[in-house]
Design a protein with these regions (language model features):
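A short secondary-structure junction signal
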Residues: 105-110, 137-141
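Conserved beta-strand elements of the Class I
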Residues: 54-56, 94-95
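Short acidic low-complexity segments
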Residues: 80-92
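Ser/Thr-glycine-rich phosphate-binding loops at phosphate-binding pockets of nucleotides
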Residues: 97-106
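PRPP-dependent phosphoribosyltransferase catalytic core
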Residues: 1-53, 61-62, 116-305
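Short helix-loop-beta junction
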Residues: 70-80
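Glycine-rich, phosphate-binding/catalytic loops in enzymes
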Residues: 112-114
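Short, charged N-terminal beta->alpha structural module
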Residues: 58-72
């Protein structure tokens, strides 16, 4: 922790430590947190319903889904004395379970493929997460309904979140639960192309926050402004270390669209999501000195797949 915070300006270090401590106490989720949510879901579901349901193991990238299925299976064995069904196409009720959903893009990629090529002609599909974001729910529903219509199949779609839904809609940006700086708090250095960081917004509206309203994650407006400013500055510095940074690499976390990044505020025992600000996870102290990854010491080094 001390090595990580020493990379910030001296006047900011104590503030960054305090804000990071507040954030992680609220937003770092352990395996116990996951198990409690999934165990409650299993206990609240009738045995017959579980017998008639198949969970999907169709994630194209990563291991989060298989990890969630392992927890669900253990819970079902302990509660109902039988294992869950996985990829069982004799059923017509399916559940896609994941841990944290940020943009919903991965969910859509996985399920668009499944709907077109593997789903029965008639079935129900429940998309379940432990933590998610309001925009992700909108994106998933919109995109998958379109895919279902294209497929010509009769698939009823529903979404559920067992934990908390975090606010990140544009219209609610002043009280969002993700990092979303005011424009005046953002200073893109001259050595970076500013175009990639300019967010799109409806005509006549500012892309950044225009004020502050308390949210679940952010309770103090001045602290939020200062923390976001610091995270942007250091995130831009990290990007400047790279010779050819990916277009999706943004100071506040990876995002395919233009802007400063997703600004995620959720961290888990499994990994540090790349949708969170770069300062938390980018870098690798095990790399040789010539490698840009050696130039920043991460607080939570990310596991890649």
């Amino acid at each position: 922790m001390l090595k990580w915070v020493s990379q910030f300006d001296e006047d900011d270090r104590l503030f960054v430590l305090k804000q990071t401590d507040l954030l992680l106490k609220k937003q770092y989720f352990t395996k116990d947190n996951f198990e409690i949510l999934l165990d409650n879901a299993i206990k609240d579901t009738a045995s017959k319903t579980l017998h008639d349901t198949s969970f999907l193991d169709v994630q194209l990238d990563g291991k989060s889904q298989s990890d969630m299925l392992e927890i669900l299976n253990n819970s079902c064995l302990n509660t109902h004395n039988f294992p869950i069904n996985i990829n069982n196409y004799t059923k017509n009720r399916f559940v896609y379970q994941d841990d944290v959903v940020f943009t919903g893009d991965r969910v859509c990629r996985d399920l668009e493929e499944w709907i077109i090529h593997s789903a029965p002609h008639q079935c129900s599909l429940l998309i379940a997460s432990l933590y998610t974001h309001t925009s992700a729910l909108y994106n998933i529903e919109k995109n998958l309904i379109q895919t279902i219509n294209i497929s010509g199949k009769s698939i009823s779609l529903s979404l559920v979140c067992f934990g908390k839904i975090y606010e990140n809609k544009f219209i609610m940006r002043n009280q969002s639960d993700v990092f979303w700086p005011k424009e005046e708090n953002v200073n893109i250095p001259n050595n970076l192309d500013p175009i990639r960081f300019i967010s799109t917004a409806p005509q006549g509206q500012a892309p950044g926050r225009t004020g502050f309203a308390a949210s679940y994650v952010f309770e103090n407006g001045n602290d939020r402004d200062r923390f976001e400013k610091i995270l942007c500055e250091k995130g831009c510095y990290i990007i400047s270390l790279c010779n050819n940074p990916a277009a999706s690499m943004k100071p506040l976390g990876y995002k395919t669209y233009r802007g400063l990044g997703f600004g995620g505020t959720i961290f888990t025992y499994r990994n540090c999501p790349n949708n969170t600000p770069l300062v938390f996870w980018w870098g690798n102290p095990n790399m040789e000195d010539w490698n840009p990854l050696s130039k920043w010491y991460p607080l939570m080094m990310r596991k890649t797949y």
